[in-house]
């Protein structure tokens, strides 16, 4: 269906079509929605787990090479993650935009958003790679350990070769997920774990008489896995199965209008800025950890790595909820969107509680995946109860913020997240950990307190949201025609 085709037949104006859709909304089959959401969540979790596992695989292998290797990779990843996560988070605007376009049955518009996303991340990958090559200045500032700095610089420069393919993969993955196409992404993500593990082992330790590359083999393995993902997904979904044709009108430079770019950036901009500011704060948190010793740096890397894996497991419901909320809002179905939001909340709480119990019962076993150092394990166990508490609170907070993101309401999440991490988490970590001598535990006490505040604010904002108004805005935005970029699309800027 072309972008200029009417999406809701029988009415001429965007406003009247939206009002008609809202008035005629069908009842929601809760059982069917639950199973559909769960199936989507399972596949999103598997693909997200696979993506996060690529980083954790590096940590697991490097942790067995020694504390210096793990600390170097951790510090390098902490600083390189600032710009990369910013661009990647900006690309998640595709979930909202493609999801709403798909829900409005405007496939061509979903393809346009993908094109814009690919161009934006390609342009932004250049300064990100430059940042990777200049990381030595920040590492010198972070630690006095010359060996850690040297290893960290090598790690970051090799890893720079993975920037562009990882961003392209993110765009294509989110594009297909917003349409409900999950299985290929899950399969590719799962296979990439095997590729990363095999590449890490062979490149670090060698095989068939070859001695391997040692430390340098780990980032090189990540580069190989990063290229494997987009090549495999594009080859299967686009070149072979041609799944994109249902939401793709072909490359069209005329689609890159200033108004569309503004709509994209009005969603991507706050999310990207929030991610960069938050990750910069996390990097500053690593400086606090550095003041407590290299063992604390390594322990924090282990705890953060475990949190990432647990996040991947519960995020399935968060991402699936965001996608389905965007779909239903784009289709003009606020009642269904609200039901999906509630289902996502209940399922997330249930999943997080199970994961928290499992994490507590397994105790040191999970941490031994990263290191066998007894001193390191004791540090990790010291903060395990605080870590589990923070994880549970943050999981619910992220779910609610994802619902707001599905509506396109990203400004409030960006401001709250940015201010809370700088004005609450960091001061608590520094004064508690360094000034008051509470040590490593203070870092995670800061996380808990910050997440309680964020959860409270996001819950308040969501409780006051007019779902019908959000659906009408989404329908209006996704009904914009290519002949009227300064009309309806211009009006949508205040909502994006």
Feature map (PLM): residue ranges:
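Short alpha-helical transmembrane segments in multi-pass integral membrane proteins
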Residues: 2-44, 98-164, 191, 195-269, ...
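Signature of the first transmembrane helix
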Residues: 12-21, 33-95, 266-289
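Residue-level hotspots within the lipid-embedded alpha helices of multi-pass solute transporters
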Residues: 48-52, 85, 125, 129, ...
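Transmembrane helical elements of multi-pass membrane transporters/channels
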Residues: 39-58, 158, 192, 225-229, ...
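Transmembrane alpha-helical segments of integral membrane proteins
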Residues: 202-203, 398-399, 424-433
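Helix-terminus/linker motif at the lipid-water interface of multi-pass membrane proteins
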Residues: 52-71, 139-146, 204-213, 272, ...
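Small-residue hotspots at the loop-to-helix junctions and early N-terminal turns
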Residues: 67-78, 152, 156, 294-309, ...
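Small-residue-rich hydrophobic transmembrane alpha-helices
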Residues: 59, 70-129, 133, 169-185, ...
């Amino acid at each position: 269906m072309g972008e200029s085709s009417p999406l809701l037949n029988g009415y001429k104006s965007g406003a009247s079509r939206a009002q008609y859709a809202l008035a005629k909304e069908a009842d929601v089959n809760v059982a069917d929605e639950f199973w559909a959401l769960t199936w989507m969540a399972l596949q999103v979790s598997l693909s997200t787990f696979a993506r996060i596992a690529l980083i954790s695989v590096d940590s697991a292998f490097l942790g067995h090479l020694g504390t210096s290797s793990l600390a170097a990779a951790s510090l390098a990843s902490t600083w390189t993650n600032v710009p990369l996560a910013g661009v990647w988070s900006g690309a998640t605007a595709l979930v909202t935009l493609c999801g709403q376009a798909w829900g409005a049955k405007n496939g061509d518009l979903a393809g346009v958003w993908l094109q814009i996303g690919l161009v934006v991340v390609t342009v932004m990958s250049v300064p990100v790679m430059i940042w990777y090559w200049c990381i030595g200045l920040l590492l010198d500032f972070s630690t006095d350990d010359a060996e850690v700095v040297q290893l960290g610089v090598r790690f970051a420069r090799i890893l720079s070769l993975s920037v562009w393919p990882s961003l392209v993969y993110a765009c294509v993955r989110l594009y297909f997920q917003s349409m409900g196409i999950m299985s290929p992404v899950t399969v590719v993500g799962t296979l990439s774990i095997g590729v990363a593990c095999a590449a890490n082992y062979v490149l670090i330790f060698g095989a068939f008489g070859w001695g391997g590359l040692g430390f340098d083999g780990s980032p090189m393995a990540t580069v190989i896995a990063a290229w494997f993902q987009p090549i495999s997904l594009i080859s299967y979904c686009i070149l072979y199965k041609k799944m994109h044709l249902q939401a793709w009108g072909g490359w069209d430079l005329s689609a890159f209008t200033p108004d569309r770019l503004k709509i994209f950036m009005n969603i991507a901009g706050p999310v990207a800025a929030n991610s960069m500011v938050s990750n910069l704060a996390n990097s500053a948190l690593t400086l606090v950890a550095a003041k407590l010793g290299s063992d604390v740096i390594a322990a924090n890397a282990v705890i953060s790595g475990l949190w990432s894996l647990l996040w991947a497991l519960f995020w399935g419901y968060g991402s699936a909820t965001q996608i389905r909320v965007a779909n239903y809002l784009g289709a003009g179905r606020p009642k269904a969107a609200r039901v999906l939001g509630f289902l996502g909340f209940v399922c997330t709480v249930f999943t997080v509680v199970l994961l928290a119990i499992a994490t507590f019962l397994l105790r040191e076993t999970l941490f031994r995946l990263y290191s066998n150092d007894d001193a390191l394990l004791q540090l990790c166990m010291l903060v395990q109860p605080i870590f589990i508490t923070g994880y549970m609170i943050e999981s619910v907070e992220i779910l609610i913020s994802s619902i707001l993101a599905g509506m396109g309401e990203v400004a409030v999440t960006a401001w709250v997240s940015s201010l809370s991490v700088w004005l609450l988490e960091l001061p608590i970590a520094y004064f508690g950990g360094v000034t008051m001598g509470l040590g490593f535990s203070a870092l995670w006490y800061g996380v808990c307190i910050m997440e309680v505040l964020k959860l409270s604010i996001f819950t308040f904002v969501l409780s006051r949201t007019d779902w019908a108004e959000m659906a009408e805005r989404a329908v209006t935005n996704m009904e914009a025609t290519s002949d009227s970029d300064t009309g309806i699309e211009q009006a949508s800027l205040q909502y994006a």
